[in-house]
């Protein structure tokens, strides 16, 4: 799909409601909002006198944010579209997508065009532009494994810059854009390197169980089989944000050192854990939360999902303060019972 022509004109929408722009469905408002469909619009922002001294927030699918109050600035709705193969060599395809493209639709598109690799990341909510910020991951795969580069615009100067993987400094659900670069850049396009030699990632039992239920052995599984299995698992475990507001997994799986893990295992031998290559141990945050008795419980209109303890939901009319109060109560209980700190994935504003 070709990228549409440049048009840097910016139309501001005053007192704009944000409930439809965050997957929690939290009712908040922005002083202004603007729909961004071209990189040139991001590049022109610093010259717009209407935006002088106003805070700016780039928003994609709104699946990684909790509004605790109205936003007294301009929300920039990233709707930059486009998907294309920018080049190809003997080993891989290099595929670019606009920052505003829906992530799941992009993953499906790569498979439909015979370019597998991203199927373990199917049905993750959000946009392509948000994927590198969080270094999204699921079922044994992180986005960084197939990341090539991205183009971002520095909002204060309008300068367009290219970032390779080293400059992005990816970590576990982390990147430069969540730390030093937070709030400074708008990601307008991301390029992925998809190897022509497909490497299935079937290390998670959930995926192999779902394949087995479909009569498919790991050896016989195709990229489409893995995609379908991941979609089925996520739909069974995670609520649809259009039905029950949520931001997917609310907490990161904590990573602790070996000594701390030994002490924890002495108290809770059945703790669900995943050894890491560096000797540390990743814990299943959902298991910790469940063991503290939070699954299915509520505080006001915010609740823990009854099938997946990692997911906090809006039962209807929840405010960002409600969600934050629930998250803090869970963190306090996990800290008290297991001595482990849980870190929230979404940004709370």
Swiss-Prot record:
One of its GO terms (cellular component) is cytosol. It is found in: Cytoplasm. It catalyses: UDP-N-acetyl-alpha-D-muramate + NADP(+) = UDP-N-acetyl-3-O-(1-carboxyvinyl)-alpha-D-glucosamine + NADPH + H(+). Pfam families: FAD_binding_4 (PF01565), MurB_C (PF02873). Residues 25-197 form the FAD-binding PCMH-type domain. Its main location: cytoplasm. Keywords: Cell cycle, Cell division, Cell shape, Cell wall biogenesis/degradation, Cytoplasm, FAD, Flavoprotein, NADP, Oxidoreductase, Peptidoglycan synthesis. Pathway: Cell wall biogenesis; peptidoglycan biosynthesis. InterPro entries: FAD-bd_PCMH, FAD-bd_PCMH-like_sf, FAD-bd_PCMH_sub1, FAD-bd_PCMH_sub2, MurB, MurB_C, MurB_C_sf, Oxid_FAD_bind_N. GO terms for molecular function: FAD binding; UDP-N-acetylmuramate dehydrogenase activity. This is UDP-N-acetylenolpyruvoylglucosamine reductase. It comes from Burkholderia orbicola (strain MC0-3). The gene is murB.
């Amino acid at each position: 799909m070709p990228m549409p022509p440049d048009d840097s004109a910016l139309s501001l929408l005053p007192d704009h409601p944000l409930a439809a722009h965050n997957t929690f469905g939290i009712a908040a408002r922005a002083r202004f909002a603007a729909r961004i469909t071209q990189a040139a619009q991001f590049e022109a922002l610093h010259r717009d006198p209407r935006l002088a001294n106003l805070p700016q927030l780039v928003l994609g699918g709104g699946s990684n944010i909790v509004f605790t109050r109205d936003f007294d600035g301009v929300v920039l709705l990233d709707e930059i579209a486009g998907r294309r193969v920018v080049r190809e060599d003997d080993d891989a395809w290099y595929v670019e997508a606009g920052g505003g493209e829906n992530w799941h639709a992009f993953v499906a598109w790569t498979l439909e065009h015979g370019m597998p690799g991203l199927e373990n990341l199917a049905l993750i909510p959000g946009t392509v532009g948000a994927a590198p910020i969080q270094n999204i991951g699921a079922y044994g795969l992180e986005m960084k494994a197939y990341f090539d580069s991205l183009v971002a615009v520095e909002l204060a100067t309008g300068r367009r810059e290219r970032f390779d993987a080293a400059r992005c400094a990816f970590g576990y659900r982390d990147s430069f854009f969540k730390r030093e670069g937070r709030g400074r850049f708008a990601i307008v396009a991301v390029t992925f390197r998809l190897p022509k030699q497909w490497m299935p990632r079937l290390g998670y039992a959930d995926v192999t169980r779902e394949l087995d239920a479909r009569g498919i052995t790991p050896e016989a599984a195709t990229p489409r089989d893995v995609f379908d299995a991941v979609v089925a698992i996520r739909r069974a475990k995670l609520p649809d944000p259009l039905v029950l507001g949520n931001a997917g997994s609310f907490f990161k799986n904590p990573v602790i050192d070996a000594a701390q893990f030994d002490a924890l295992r002495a108290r809770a031998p059945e703790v669900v854990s995943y050894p890491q290559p560096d000797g540390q141990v990743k814990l299943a945050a959902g298991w910790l939360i469940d063991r503290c008795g939070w699954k299915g419980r509520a505080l006001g209109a915010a609740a823990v999902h009854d099938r997946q303890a990692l997911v906090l939901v809006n039962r209807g009319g929840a405010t960002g303060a409600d969600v934050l109060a629930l998250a803090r109560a869970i963190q306090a209980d996990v800290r008290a019972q297991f001595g482990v700190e849980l870190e929230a994935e979404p940004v709370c504003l």
